[in-house]
Amino acid sequence: MKKSNTTKALLIGLVLLSGIYSCKKNHPGPQQRFDIGQTNLVADTAGYGAAKIDPALKNAWGIAVNPNGVVWISANHSATSPVYDKTGATLRPPVTIPSVNAGDPGAPTGIVFNGSTDFGGNKFIFAGEDGVLTAWAGGNAAVKVADRSAAGAVYKGLAIATDGGASFLYAANFKGKKIAVFDSNFNLVTTKPFADTSIPADFGPFNIQNIAGMLYVTYAKLKGPENEDDEAGPGNGYVNVFRPDGTLVGRFASTGTLNSPWGITHAPAGFAAPFETILVGNFGDGRINVFSLQGIYIGQLQNNGQTIGIEGLWALDFLKSNATNTDPLFFTAGPHDESHGIFGSLKSTITTTGGSMGNSSGY
């Protein structure tokens, strides 16, 4: 990681921490309008206006990228990981994701890139709804590295972070209503609590994302009686911020416009607002909520005054993480009840209507 990026990440974390415990309000001034144009790069079938068709891209879910800009996607309903460049061009055959038994198809959701020699040197690691973690170091198939299927785990998201100089994986066990933590040898760790008793009992962690060294956890409502999928609806969502040791920093967002939130990312200044923001995507209604770094709600992404809604929206990722990133926002989606898949991008254009919008820390 470049020194400038590290410094920026630390500053973001400090801003977040200061905002959680302050009581100042947001003071809007003259504004600019940020119009967001959508481009569907790849879809699994015709009918979505995508330039490229890849039948493997069914229920496109998590996104991870290596330092060369190569994009890996979890295709949940084809049990594969298609690999593209930033234009959606296929770079290699999709990698097969196994389940509990090697010959059975997996159900990948979250995915992370591992740039270290930890985790057996595997470069891409996947979480699955079958309660299995799989990893890829080469070849045409990932391999199973952890199996919590017997305990009924349903992993919907995955993050990687360091704590005390050691690397860990963090999997959002939706059905189990907890964050499962694994060490660099894929052993389960039980000393990191990730607890918040103020979250209603019928909500579970839907996703987890590392932003500037903090772990953002989104929560969705469990759909009974199986409690394996979410129950979408206005206000059905929470977002918390935790340290990698599992201690709670604070509540970032609650109910309101949240609707089964899954995708979450840090946006550079000039994308959704003149200042840096946190974007939280709703799987429930496909809308993308915009917050200040301190959790102040700003609005939802729009284009020409119309709120953007991407059916089956999953991941949001700028692929590069810095304040001056010029990449568009990349997204994945599983439209038509997750039976199809889209990989696309969102690009911001600015219409000036005055100065910039002021922003101060606070909840």
What are these regions (language model features)?
Residues 2-10:
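Bacterial N-terminal signal peptides that target proteins for export
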Residues 24-363:
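Sequence/structural signature of beta-propeller domains
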Residues 18-22:
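C-terminal motif of bacterial Sec signal peptides marking the signal peptidase cleavage site
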